[in-house]
Design a protein with these regions (language model features):
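Mid-domain alpha/beta scaffold segments of enzyme catalytic cores
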Residues: 1-255
Length: 255
């Protein structure tokens, strides 16, 4: 069984001392490729994921500004993102979007930076990775007006209605460890109705470890539990989930 972790954060301090061992465990679990998300701790640290991807052949990267860091953006930020995106290991743009849960940046600033990054990603012809938390209606309104192209709704935690809205926009939906939580019945209902060709899996490491590791530092090898739960929800085998999600990821990023 070969799997792709479509969203992880391997560049931060939580993996500073044992990343080689983490990636060895991922390989042993069948995780053959990983997409590490290049938001860092905001500008000017978005290059950290690219540096990780350059070190490991199985790791690829994105670049972008997380909505938490929208207030740190300067005009130079967009030039830096454009330059980093020229690296052949960069295969996506994100994670970008809106986060009204923490409001680390003013909402108007978040929206402006989101729109500008959509323009940049469109020009670069890169798929986008969307982060949205307690901001779905504003997120989807902006996408309807400013985006036409492929993308991933990362860490899908919505219900079936939100899933349909994302699918109608042409997005793929990525499910992570939350799918295994006892409180996630609505997420599992949504996961059951996503078409085969729009389904992805992810970890969002080091966050949101699946049961039985909930509350621990997450790592890519743990994704097998999410895959097992997703297979159970959809009435198929884990091998089927692995095959379709790997194919979908490769199609999405043009590889």
């Amino acid at each position: 069984m070969h799997l792709v972790d479509s969203h992880c954060h391997l560049d931060g301090p939580k993996f500073a001392n044992d990343l080689d061992a983490v990636l060895d465990r991922a390989a042993a679990a069948g995780i053959t490729r990983m997409l590490t998300i290049g938001t860092g701790d905001g500008p000017p640290e978005v290059d950290r994921a690219v540096r990780v991807a350059e070190r490991y052949p199985q790791v690829f990267a994105t670049v972008g500004v997380h909505p938490h860091d929208a207030g740190k953006v300067t005009p130079q930020t967009f030039d830096d993102l454009r330059a980093l995106a020229a690296n052949p290991k960069v295969i996506g743009f994100g994670e970008v979007g809106l986060d009204y849960h923490y409001d680390h940046a003013p909402r108007e600033v978040q929206r402006d930076v989101f729109i500008e990054q959509l323009r940049l990603a469109r020009g670069l012809k890169l798929p986008i990775i969307i982060h949205t938390r307690e901001a779905w209606q504003d997120t989807i309104a902006i996408l309807r007006e400013h985006w036409q192209g492929p993308g991933i709704r990362h860490c899908f935690t919505g219900d079936a209605a939100q899933a349909r809205e994302g699918l109608d926009l042409g997005f793929s939906l990525a499910f992570g460890g939350v799918l295994t939580f006892n409180t996630a019945a609505a997420v599992r209902e949504a996961a059951a109705m996503v078409p085969d060709d729009r389904l992805l899996v992810e970890t969002d490491v080091p966050f949101l470890a699946p049961i039985p590791w909930r509350g621990k530092r997450n790592e890519p090898s743990f994704m097998v539990e999410t895959v097992r739960k997703l297979a159970e929800v959809r009435g198929v085998t884990p091998e089927h989930i692995a095959a379709i999600t790997t194919r979908n990821f490769n199609t999405l990023v043009g590889q």
